[in-house]
Amino acid sequence: HMIMIIPEEEYKNIPKIKPEIVKLVKETKENIWVHIKTPVDLWNYGLDSKYEFLDAVSASFPIYDNGFLGALRVANIHKTLVLRKFEKYVASYVIAGSLVRGTADKDSDVDTFVIIDDTDVKKMTRIDLLDRLRGIIYDYIREASALAVVKNILNVQVYLLTDFWQSVKDAHPVMFTFIR
């Protein structure tokens, strides 16, 4: 499979682009399926809970990358590490910021936030739990950056589920931005 991610403003040109790409692929005499997508298409796969497609794109071997794929790759590797450690406690792992808005460049940071379900934790205070979780999750940032071999800085905000919902009830503007 070959996936070509084009800017959103080029969406209307897909009927012109696809035949050219298919012609180039046929010249190679390889059996390659061509998929042309936009970043919005990728985010919609995530919204539709089709994470395996995003995983495949982030694990791909890019022929050309303007920074989008590298940023997606480092976030996906970090997500995998966090899920492996806290599997049943991760309520949400979300990519936000310029990457999702489509304004990121190759040097842009990658904004993510993780919401951890703390509702069954009884043996430590929420502050102690949050400090411990942040330490582990921040250690995974270094590991993900090394594995992804990208320069994009991964910024991770860690929230406990009870604190997140309390902030939503208090109409905290940051939480409403995340929900949007």
Where are the language model's segments positioned?
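Catalytic core of pol beta-like nucleotidyltransferases
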Residues: 6-96, 100-107, 116-180
